[in-house]
Amino acid sequence: MGLTDIKRELKKLDKDKLIDLIADLYKKNKSVKEFFDFYVNSDERELFNKYRDKVFLAFYPKRGYRFKLKDGKQAISDFKKLGPSSDLVADLMLFYVETGVKFTNDFGNIDESFYSSLETTYVAALTLMRKENLLDKFADRASKVVSDTSGIGWGFHDYLSNVHSDFYADYSDDTDEPIEQQEKGGIIKLGGQ
């Protein structure tokens, strides 16, 4: 049964039956409950913090020492489905990468698939930031991720550094003061001095 069929059947229901159906879904399905909780009371920051905690626990579980990247990625995916602002989605994605980098620095090199997951999320986060004109807002954190990966294996640092350069090349060109050298060995003029 497709969405068109569902819509056709829902249109046949009267208001009370529709309310009962939604209430039943609300009780039985956790993701529906979260969606309607967000829809009715859209406190994005509170919801963001909840999913941020889920991402953190994927790397640093309360019990045991086994990280679960899948849980962290699922938290990001579930958060996106609720329809929060792009700003908070980008923030959560970047937090995933930051936490993964911290985990590596705390416990040593992991494996290639671990770094691949972080790389993919970093690229997705920066892509979203560019699309939504958020690169400036997250510039310091995006740079810190790269600097914090220095010395990490599997070509991880080099890859993130290249990605960062690709996304922030225009950004750094726009913010640098123009420097002109009058002649070789001459005085360097900064800005319009």
Tell what function each PLM region has.
Residues 2-66:
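N-terminal interaction modules that seed assembly of large macromolecular complexes
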Residues 3-5, 29, 85-86, 107, ...:
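Short, structured coil/loop segments at alpha-helix boundaries
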Residues 9, 35, 39, 54, ...:
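Residues that form generic nucleotide/phosphate-binding pockets
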Residues 18-21, 30-34, 44, 48, ...:
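Residue-level signal for secondary-structure boundary elements
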Residues 28, 36-40, 54, 73, ...:
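Residue-level signal for alpha-helical context at structural boundaries
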Residues 59-138:
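Charged linear interaction tracts used for macromolecular binding and regulation
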Residues 120-193:
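Eukaryote-biased recognition of C-terminal alpha-helical segments
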